[in-house]
Amino acid sequence: MSDNIEIYQDIAIHAIESVFEGEYHNTLGIPMPQIKILMPDDADYITGQYYIMIDDTWQIHLNFGKLPISFKEFEDEVKVLTRHEIEHYMCCPFDVITHLRMLKCIIDVYKKEFSHLGIDIQHACGSISNQAADIIVDTKNYFRNPQDTLVSEINWIKKGANIKNCPRHSKLMFLTKEALWGTSLEINETDHELLGIVRDLAEKFKVNGIEDKASFLNKTKEYARTFFSLYIKDQLSPNDDGQQGSQSQQGDQSQQGGQSQQGGQSQQGGQSQQGGQSQQGGQSQQGGQSQQ
């Protein structure tokens, strides 16, 4: 077992170096990711936990859970995760100020239009912000590395709960990526009203280009508005499988908001939802700065 772990650690190190050196040419100015192999008794073992701290260091943490049998599959996944976290630093939110402004946008939308829902918005805003940021960075990475990004996204969805049984608002991030990428993520959504809402949201993410930093706040507002509207629909009319939207279902798939906040620092990125506060900073939460 220990020998295998060392092999996987070596593969991870080489894959990370290939991204930092081969794709970003050692120009990032952030430390190399810290890696860890999680044990089966760890709460995040099935999905792993991946995030970047949004602070002065922008330290990436890659905590790998259940490992694939194929070394090549693992190597490809490490590269995808590394690119994902790097792009939270390079693209969205890009800096601490933008991260905090994205959180404020979501809080403002909630307080002005949806405060009657009774959601703990200070707790939830990080996850929602991380979802919006993930759409942006994953779409950028999809157009740069389509096959690797697509395979990783499909596998990630399959690691979570059965997405067909998830409420509408919990599918929003994945369906929006599917619409933007123009290719199937094997979600096989049949709710035509929901698909129309997603198409409209995807068009708003396309305005001025997916990477336009001046548009990030507007895109975050539109995502939050759509998210809360779908949340209401889920409360009033649960899907056919009887799954009712609840506040805890914002990341039914432990993949949504890799944003969880630790120690007051926000982290973004990974794709796993951690009960606390979300951290972006990749891909979730406030104050701090970390993203998943």
Q: What label would you give each PLM region?
A:
Residues 1-292:
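Short, functionally important secondary-structure microenvironments
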